[in-house]
Amino acid sequence: MKKLYGVTVAMITPFTEEGNVDVKALDKLTEMLISRGVNCLYPCGTTGEMVHLSEEERKTVAETVIRAASGRANVFIHCGAMTQKETENLVKHAYEAGADGVGVVTPMFLGVTDKEMTAYYEKISSLVPAEFPIYLYNIPQCSGNDLKKTTAEQITENCKNVIGIKYSYPDMMRTLEYLEIPNFSVLHGCDKMFAELLLMGCDGTVSGVAGVFPEPFVAVYEAWKHKDIPAMQKCRRYVLSFAICCAVGQICPGLSSSCTQRFAGRRNESTSTGSAGERDSRYNERN
C-alpha cells in the first residue's frame, strides 16, 4: 500500500471571487507543488477549509487534484466530515476517483467514547478494499475528541487498511507513543519541528506552510535522506522562519492569501502577509 511520507502538503482550497472552487487555480497549485518536489498531497483537510465546503465541492477538489497530479505524487484525500454519512460518501468517492488513499479525522464537536471511536473507523474501513490505505487524523484542539494510543492500536488490529496517523497537536510524548505501534506510519502537523520529528522517527510532516513555501521543507527532507545533519539544521531555520511568517492572523486565511500571492498572482489585501514575499526573496538569494 502507498503511504504518506516526507513533505506532505495540506493544500489550501482556492476560490473564485464568486465563492466557488477555483478549479483552474487548483490545477496550477497542484502543478507548482509537484514541480517543487513535494512528496504527497493532502487536500480537503483543516487547511483546505473542509468545514466550509459542501460534499459536492469536496468531490470536485478531490477529482481535480487527482487528475492534475496524474500519479506524480501520492494523493490522499481527507474525507472526515461532520456527519458519518458524508464521511462515508467521500471515502467511497475518493476510492472510485483514483486516490492513493484517504485520511479521516475523528468525530467532531460531540464527544465520543473510545469504543465509539473504534466502531466509527471500523465502519469507514469496511467501505473500501483492504488494500486501500486509510490514515487516522487526530487534531483534538479542533475536533474535541482525542485519539489515544490504545484506541489507535485497537483500530489498526481490527482494520488492516488503517496504516497510520496524522497527529496535529504538539504533544511529543503522545507522538512517541504512536511511534511504538508496530507497522504504523506517523506524520505530524507540527511543521515547525519537521527536522526534529524526522529524528524522532516520524515518516514526515503534513504541512500547510509547505503549501506556500515547499522549498525549505523539501531541502530538510533531502538532507535527512542523505544523513546530512548540518544541512538539515541549516534548512530547518528557514522552515521555522516561514512557519512563523505564515502564522499572521487566522491560519487558513493567512495561508490562502500567501499561497495565492506566490502561485496564483493574486493578493488578499485584508490579510497581513506582506513579510511572506520578503522572506521568500531572502531564501532564494541564499540558496
List each language-model region with its residue ranges:
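Short, conserved catalytic or adaptor-binding loops enriched in Gly and charged residues
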Residues: 1, 155, 262-265
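Active-site beta->alpha loop and helix N-cap motifs at the rims of alpha/beta catalytic domains
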Residues: 2-9, 13-144, 154
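Short glycine/serine/threonine-biased micro-segments
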Residues: 4, 8, 43-46, 76-78, ...
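C-terminal alpha-helical cap/extension of soluble enzyme domains
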Residues: 6-14, 32, 36-37, 199-202, ...
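Basic, gly/Ser/Thr/Pro-rich low-complexity segments located predominantly at protein N termini
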Residues: 11, 24, 50-53, 85, ...
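A general structural signal for well-ordered alpha-helical segments in protein cores
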Residues: 26, 58, 62, 87, ...
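Catalytic alpha/beta core domains of metabolic enzymes, predominantly
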Residues: 127-132, 139-247
